[in-house]
């Protein structure tokens, strides 16, 4: 359900604005999207896992807030990110 350290480092390297940048909205959104994707696959086999579903909803809300923040501060970065991640909107 969680992502491996190697995958997380790859996401950070791909979406970071500079080396070692783990706090930028782009990186946080990319990591959350990966975790959301993993949990979505988990629910295909474990439909009654409501405890994890609550965590999924929390992650989706957090990603939504980060996307709204990014859109507010820089719309070009926002549009580039959602296109790169393949998110609707």
Curated annotation (Swiss-Prot):
<comment type="similarity">
    <text>Belongs to the universal ribosomal protein uS15 family.</text>
</comment>
<keyword id="KW-0694">RNA-binding</keyword>
<dbReference type="GO" id="GO:0003735">
    <property type="term" value="F:structural constituent of ribosome"/>
</dbReference>
<comment type="function">
    <text>One of the primary rRNA binding proteins, it binds directly to 16S rRNA where it helps nucleate assembly of the platform of the 30S subunit by binding and bridging several RNA helices of the 16S rRNA.</text>
</comment>
<comment type="subunit">
    <text>Part of the 30S ribosomal subunit. Forms a bridge to the 50S subunit in the 70S ribosome, contacting the 23S rRNA.</text>
</comment>
<dbReference type="GO" id="GO:0006412">
    <property type="term" value="P:translation"/>
</dbReference>
<keyword id="KW-0689">Ribosomal protein</keyword>
<keyword id="KW-0687">Ribonucleoprotein</keyword>
<dbReference type="InterPro" id="IPR005290">
    <property type="entry name" value="Ribosomal_uS15_bac-type"/>
</dbReference>
<dbReference type="GO" id="GO:0019843">
    <property type="term" value="F:rRNA binding"/>
</dbReference>
<dbReference type="InterPro" id="IPR000589">
    <property type="entry name" value="Ribosomal_uS15"/>
</dbReference>
<dbReference type="GO" id="GO:0022627">
    <property type="term" value="C:cytosolic small ribosomal subunit"/>
</dbReference>
<dbReference type="Pfam" id="PF00312">
    <property type="entry name" value="Ribosomal_S15"/>
</dbReference>
<protein>
    <recommendedName>
        <fullName>Small ribosomal subunit protein uS15</fullName>
    </recommendedName>
</protein>
<comment type="function">
    <text>Forms an intersubunit bridge (bridge B4) with the 23S rRNA of the 50S subunit in the ribosome.</text>
</comment>
<keyword id="KW-0699">rRNA-binding</keyword>
<dbReference type="InterPro" id="IPR009068">
    <property type="entry name" value="uS15_NS1_RNA-bd_sf"/>
</dbReference>
């Amino acid at each position: 359900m969680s992502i491996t350290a190697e995958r997380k480092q790859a996401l950070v390297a791909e979406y970071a604005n500079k080396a070692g940048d783990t706090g930028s909205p782009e990186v946080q959104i990319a990591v959350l999207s990966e975790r959301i994707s993993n949990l979505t696959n988990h629910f295909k086999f474990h439909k009654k896992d409501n405890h994890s579903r609550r965590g999924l909803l929390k992650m989706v809300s957090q990603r939504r807030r980060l996307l709204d923040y990014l859109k507010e501060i820089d719309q070009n970065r926002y549009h580039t990110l959602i296109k790169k991640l393949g998110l609707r909107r």
